[in-house]
Amino acid sequence: MNIQIVEGDILDQEVEVIVNSWNRNIIPWWLLLPQGVSGAIKKNGGTAPFKEVAKFGAIPLGEARLTSAGKLPYQNIIHVAGINMFWFASEYSVKHSVLNAMRIVEEQQFSSVAFPLIGSGSGNRGKQWALKIMKSTFSGIMSDAEVLVVEYAK
């Protein structure tokens, strides 16, 4: 697997699919004020992806769900339940978010995917903490997909 760590905006990456670090989908999407990647998706891509992910109901911690990309230029968005209902990321939630997002990448045969640093923003963990867990998890995955891990930079 080809993994690159880049600085920038996940919405500027030329990939087939992006990953959105979402919550467990317990609170209705329209009651939330999305921040970070979710906020950028809503602002630039509209509400369609969030309406779609709401139809799945509660998402188990670390699981992933596939939706359209709304008005964004991607084939799809993979939403991962990277934080618990107390808005906190754990090693389990980050590891399983990566594993389950990559499972969807493989099932859908996407050739490229961009991940944010899961758990580093709304998950109240630092960038280095998230990156360490993500790199360790990727090391155990076999895939032909190009993977970008995007560290947000303005």
Label the model's feature ranges.
Residues 82-154:
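Phosphate/ribose-phosphate-bearing ligand recognition and processing surfaces
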Residues 10-56:
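Short, conserved "active-site rim" segments that organize catalytic pockets and cofactor/ligand binding
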Residues 19, 78, 115:
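Conserved, mostly hydrophobic/aromatic
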